[in-house]
Amino acid sequence: MANKIFLDTNIVVDFIIKREFELAATEQIFDSIHNNKLEAYISESVISTSIYLLRQYKIDTLAIFRDLCKFIHVAAFNRNVLFMPIEKFSDTEDGLLYFLANHNKMNYFITRNKKDFVYTVPSLSVLTPDEFIKTIFSPR
């Protein structure tokens, strides 16, 4: 069974605009998703926030997300997520996304800003793209 990963907004934006931060690892993650080696999820808010952040680049973000959603699942929020300890996060959106991923039994939460994730649960690791690639694809 493939590892289930949740992609934070910054990872999706980095991939779309080819931002240099850990770009090789980010591209390897998306290649693995496309080749069905990883089962990836985002949320509706990741899509809407990314579209908002990418408006300055004058690219067809709707077409990009239509394509991405052919191989990336969209996890829906439900009220159970709202009752999780989101207030432990300094960034409410990060808390919502993290607990959405946890509620949907993800194995890994991939983000560029690990510092915002001071409260985590043992069943859901928070990793940068490089850390994830080293953890999953490095020989043991």
Map each language-model feature to its residues.
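Alpha-helix capping/helix-boundary segments
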Residues: 11, 46, 81, 97, ...
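PIN-domain endoribonuclease scaffold, especially VapC-family toxins
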Residues: 27-88, 95, 99, 122
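Short, surface-exposed amphipathic charged segments that create phosphate/polyanion-binding patches used
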Residues: 89-91, 140
